[in-house]
């Protein structure tokens, strides 16, 4: 299949990022966005038509000068797939948007929220988001905003962090 080599390439890029970029304090924003694109494409293949996905990321060339801490954005995207896509239901959705402006970068992730399905029973409190919040407190103390809230049938995460050049 033509997609198998593409998948292997995306997976190898993800692994390379985890091995060689994650130990750095700051990385170019476009590197983080490339990892998100690869991760999302792998998940799209996994879920197929059960998932409606909308992703709006800025052009990578414009972002190479901006630096952020690695894996901050990816953690919220992973969480959306973990809790926002149902194995049983077909009306799952995820929206991801990144916007860069005036020394800041914002990530908005909106994902479907399911009531009482086997997909989310017992998974209300995980350590993933708590670890990301602790990381934000260490790296961006008093310089970030994080809003997480339920809005109807969706869970919304909005994060704003400063970028350095």
What is each model feature region?
Residues 162-165:
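C-terminal end segment of the histidine kinase catalytic
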Residues 1-158:
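Two-component histidine phosphotransfer core
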